[in-house]
Amino acid sequence: PHNYSPDLYRRYSTYCRNYDGNSLFKIASGASDYDYNWTKVLMDRVGGRMHGLSLHYYTVSGWNGSKGSATQFSKDDYYWTLGKCREIEDVIKKHCTIMDEYDPQKNVALMLDEWGTWWDTEPGTNPGHLYQQNTLRDAFVASLSFDIFHKYTDRLKMANIAQIVNVLQSMILTSGKNMVLTPTYYVFKMYNVHQDATYIPLELNCDMMDVRDNRRIPMVSATASKDPNGKIHISMSNVDADNAQEVTINLSGTKAKKAVGEILTSTNLTDYNSFENPDNVKPVPFKEVKINKDILKIKLPAKSIVTIELQ
């Protein structure tokens, strides 16, 4: 397939032409997670003929047998999930390094067109439809993924969760005329302030945890940006299931006088929104934040996701 794919791309892209003043953005079918040789071969053979190269990465325990329940899991399972989720950064970094070798000007975009959690389908549903529930654990997969994606936007130009409605880690679940918004939906909503904004690099120092399969995860994840109106937004996740985290941020040069925000959390990691209880997990105003001169102090409750706006 590594040698066959460039030939297929070359063949079909030749017949995909621009018409009526429109320009096609041609994306080659790229690798799944750790298949770095796929990226190397495509960039070597057709890198100058494409505009983008796709990549898939799922937070999944394996492709054979049970993938685990979406709503019934242990704390150990939760931490393993976050470790697997965060490994996407290493995957993105390695694919980007290969692309840089052939395309140092970054003309070819990396397009992460499938990502998210993949659990066993909900009991009683059609297995082929991949319908799964969505808990606070899935919300953390979304927030940690966003924090990582934000760091690589010089190459990563698209990151599509799979999918939006009723499939895998979706943002919306429907049943007949009923609709429910998932915890993942609310993370998307809380992070939309970073769209069309300028990324602000963060230096983050926090405790680390060793998790299953020889992975390590930081207890706090974060990202920040400045929007076109000059407002700074900071999103943070405290992944510690049991303990709050005190976060201190140096705001030197921002002239911020106050901060407002919202928080997404729940009593249990396994909590989710159902058609019977659609508002079980949703954001509420967040007030545990103080500014003293150039120092921002935030108390993040256990298992919480927060976005604040500096004013």
Residue ranges and their predicted role:
Residues 2-146, 206-216:
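Noncatalytic carbohydrate-binding groove/subsite architecture in carbohydrate-active enzymes
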